[in-house]
């Protein structure tokens, strides 16, 4: 009788031990946070903000010690979508990242200036903005609006694009718009001689803006992950009880 009881006790303890080990393994596996990637997708203004002699923004972003990976991708003449002088527009560039398994946790979009050529077409702007936002999906996005003063046409076109951007962003809860147009209008000396690109002081200001936006985006990304992970761990560790 005693031997049978001891055998049952040993079997019960073995089952409990296995359950505890399994629970701890699952809990720890789920507790590992995924790597977070920030992508800044822009044109020549972003290139200048990242150039070592101007804004040098990449090391400043890394110094935040927030996102595990920071990608600053700025290319001359890049537009949002459609034909471009540069090799890849914004949509194609983002699709390329997805194809190579780069999955950004948050995105700063700084495009639109090179989509103003031709004529002022509200539907044209809207279609391209929506195309990129749809591709990006539901991760946090900040879009920096545009400002060009290199001709009367661009002075008129920039606010139209920005108005369309503001309206479209309302349809995407994960998207916010930053008003670069107002910032640089208050600091016209940031513009270079061509009234399109920037002086070094302007690129430094743009880099500072990117750093601020990156910190804000991190504060959005982290609570989502932390809340989910905490809930999962609590649920897992309460199973044995």
Regions found by a protein language model. Name each.
Residues 1-41, 45-52, 64-66, 100-105, ...:
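N-terminal secretory targeting modules
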Residues 20-21, 28-31, 59, 63-82, ...:
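Extracellular/periplasmic envelope-modification machinery, especially enzymes
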Residues 33-41, 45-127, 150-152, 159-160:
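Conserved SGNH/GDSL esterase-like catalytic core that processes O-acyl groups on lipids
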Residues 41-43, 144, 178:
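Active-site flanking residues adjacent to catalytic metal/cofactor-binding acidic residues
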Residues 109-111, 142-145:
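Conserved beta-strand segments of the P-loop GTPase G domain that flank and frequently precede/overlap
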Residues 128-136:
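Catalytic-core regions built around general acid/base machinery
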Residues 137-141:
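A short helix->loop->beta-strand "cap" motif at the edges of active sites that frequently abuts
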Residues 149-233, 238-240:
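Catalytic His-Asp segment of secreted/periplasmic serine-dependent ester chemistry enzymes
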């Amino acid at each position: 009788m005693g031997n049978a009881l001891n055998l049952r006790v040993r079997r019960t303890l073995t089952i409990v031990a296995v359950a505890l080990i399994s629970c701890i393994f699952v809990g720890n596996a789920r507790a590992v946070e995924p790597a977070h990637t920030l992508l800044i997708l822009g044109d020549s203004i972003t290139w200048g903000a990242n150039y070592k002699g101007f804004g040098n923004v990449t090391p400043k972003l890394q110094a935040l010690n927030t996102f595990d990976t920071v990608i600053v991708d700025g290319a001359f003449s890049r537009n949002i979508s459609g034909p471009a002088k540069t090799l890849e527009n914004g949509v194609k560039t983002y699709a390329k990242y997805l194809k190579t398994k780069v999955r950004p946790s948050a995105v700063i979009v700084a495009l639109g200036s090179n989509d103003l050529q031709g004529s002022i077409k509200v539907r044209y702007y809207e279609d391209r903005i929506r195309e990129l936002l749809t591709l990006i999906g539901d991760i946090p996005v900040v879009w920096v609006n545009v400002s060009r003063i290199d001709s009367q046409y661009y002075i008129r076109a920039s606010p139209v694009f920005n108005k369309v951007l503001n309206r479209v962003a309302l349809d995407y809860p994960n998207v916010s718009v930053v008003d670069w147009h107002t910032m640089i209008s208050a600091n016209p000396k940031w513009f270079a001689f061509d009234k399109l690109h920037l002086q070094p002081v302007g690129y430094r200001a743009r880099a500072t803006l990117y750093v601020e936006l990156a910190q804000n985006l991190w504060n959005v990304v982290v609570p989502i992950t932390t809340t989910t992970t905490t809930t999962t761990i609590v649920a897992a560790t309460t199973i044995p009880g």
